């Protein structure tokens, strides 16, 4: 009960959050004795509670006649639904995928977050009164206008799904893949679901993954499990400046992934058939800090070389995808395509359309699971205030 007071998905955060650079990194015992393993504790407590039959106590809830449509069954949408139903507001969640979780289910591999975790959470949320409309894409299977008309409020928890690119020539060549389609296709295979796209198989291939975050680690470790012949992760800064979890880097190394640091991709090499056969790199040295305080990677003259590869995965992160179906409703976006929904206002995370709220990656940009959960919960509180519940 205590862990659920501030977190709608503690069993997930205990598994996927980079605790080493968050809570455990700030632990006062870290220097001398090693940090308290907060993630493992969070995971154990929640798993044990589920094993013992725990479920949220909804006996005190007085149901109102209010109902809210939630677009997106990822961490922000699920967190919003959790808070709403606990306060007697009907929550109906719409999502284009066949299972809940969004990227928790389809983007994070099963070796890091077991698929049964979200299946169990769907059962719990359903018993709490959350209704799920899966395989339902807004703008295609149901129109936003219908949701705005039929519900007292709408929450947008649609995440960020557009892959960032490096701006290299030949990025669309055969053998070059974006991280998310690769990970999603693998999940459909693992879950034995009918995939809308072909399975991307790295078996027997020389794989180079570009990027240094947790998504890159998911890609290299998935490639290993698909029996790639060789897997290399190339990152433009040094190891100390990698944004990903230290634990994930350690796991990848132990599984056979090779790391090459201070390498910046400058081109893709193709054979006569147009298929990728290598990545051209230039070595880098770290220069002056950028606006975020991280030292800039600067190219070293005369250090160009080619690394052989017949599969290249781009794992540079995600940015907001186009949402044309929002345009007629006066929902403003910022210059990066993120939904404007400030947390500090009368109704938290309300957009420029008073009936529509938003939170998570669609508002702040690609970030951690725990921040999406937090914003989903706070947006739900804003909705409750708006509905005067």
Describe every region a protein language model picked out:
Residues 172-204, 289-366:
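FAD-site-proximal beta/loop scaffold in flavoenzymes
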Residues 1-3, 31-39, 70-138, 164-171, ...:
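Beta1-alpha1 glycine-rich phosphate/pyrophosphate-binding loop at the start
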Residues 219, 362-388:
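A conserved FAD-binding loop/helix module that cradles the flavin
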